[in-house]
């Protein structure tokens, strides 16, 4: 288990302004490298925990919905402030914020989080990744609903799939399978139990 999560090495209040600044940095970086504003992708990881100096927080964007997941008690406690800051940073780019942390928080923290919308409520859950459209089940699916961090690996598979047979074990949404088919695989088998 993780004993300490460091949000800042400066003495500063962890408040709305802090969250807004951190989320702006994360969003600006994704814009600069072409992830956040992309005509063939409307799905990306906005916050990747420690990678964005926000340990214990994951925020994935699926079209107009942000799915927020807390992995620490502190993130859970600040979820509403984080959601407000996220709304300000993203503006009209997101209409919904879904909080999904029932299974990710430490059981010893005596927290009883409930999944649910913190903003909006639309279940328009079609997300686009390199032109492919996926149904994302953030309500009941694993993690935030889709393994966003595997996008480049799926794209890489597409380049190697031509005339090959592909076995996609633990396929979940079948993302790798669709890329393999689009890449010209002669046969694709997808297996999952969830």
Describe the function of each predicted region.
Residues 15-22, 74, 78-82:
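Short amphipathic alpha-helical segments
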Residues 47-54, 58-60, 76-147, 155:
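Non-catalytic substrate-recognition/targeting regions of SAM-dependent transferases
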């Amino acid at each position: 288990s993780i004993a300490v999560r460091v949000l800042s090495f400066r003495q500063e209040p962890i408040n709305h302004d802090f969250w807004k600044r951190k989320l702006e940095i994360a969003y600006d970086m994704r814009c600069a490298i072409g992830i956040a504003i992309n005509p063939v992708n409307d799905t990306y990881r906005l916050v990747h925990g420690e990678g964005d100096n926000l340990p214990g927080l994951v925020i994935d964007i699926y079209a107009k919905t942000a799915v927020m997941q807390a992995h620490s008690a502190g993130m859970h406690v600040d979820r509403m402030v984080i959601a407000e800051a996220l709304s300000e940073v993203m503006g009209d780019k997101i209409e919904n914020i879904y909080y999904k942390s029932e299974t990710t928080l430490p059981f010893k923290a005596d927290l009883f989080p409930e999944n649910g919308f913190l903003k909006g409520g639309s279940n328009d859950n079609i997300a686009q990744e390199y032109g492919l459209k996926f149904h994302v089940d953030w309500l009941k699916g694993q993690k935030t609903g889709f393994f966003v961090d595997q996008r480049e690996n799926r794209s890489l598979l597409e380049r190697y799939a031509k005339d090959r047979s592909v076995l996609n074990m633990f396929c979940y949404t079948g993302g790798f399978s669709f890329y393999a088919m689009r890449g010209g695989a002669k046969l694709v088998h997808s297996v999952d139990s969830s």
